[in-house]
Amino acid sequence: MSRILFIGAHPDDVELGCGGTISKFSDLGYNISVLIIAEGTSGRFDEKDKDTKKVATHIQNRKQNCTNSLKILGVNNIKFCDLPCGNLNIVPLLKINKLIEDEIRSFKPEIIFTHSSVDTNKDHRIVFESTKIATRPSAF
């Protein structure tokens, strides 16, 4: 069975950007995995509020909504890495690369979808760059 990996920066990126594609490949019987790099919420709050229960609850809700949406589309393998939203530029690129490389080694996808290199969101561009690095021929 063919395997497809979708890599998104935040919860909702994959289902909003590729929902139709996911649904089609799922209906065709492909094995689909989704990797979400950042938690998708903390960047929306002031620095003083980032470690509050409100933020933690918001993160959990976003993850649950993402999981529910992806299950409707036929995805059962979803991994959240929980890196800081809106701040992937302060995370060592090597760490993001490793998360993606580990998922590729584990899942062994034949096709990978991710963000565009010209996306306006900086987290999206960083995930694109890390995906490009993680999929270089010398990586495997």
Model-predicted regions and their roles:
Residues N87, T120-N121:
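Short glycine-rich, flexible loops that bind phosphorylated cofactors or substrates
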Residues F140:
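Active-site cores that bind ATP or allylic diphosphates and position pyrophosphate for catalysis
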Residues N121-T135:
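Short Gly/Thr/Asp-enriched flexible loops that form oxyanion-binding sites at enzyme active sites
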Residues M1-F107, I133-P137:
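Active-site rim/loop-helix segments in enzyme catalytic domains that contact anionic ligands
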Residues I111:
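Short, Asp-centered acidic motifs that coordinate Mg2+ and/or phosphate
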Residues D82-P84, T114-S117:
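Short, well-ordered beta-to-alpha junction loops that form the rim of enzyme active sites
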Residues H10, H115, N121:
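Histidine-centered divalent metal-coordination motifs
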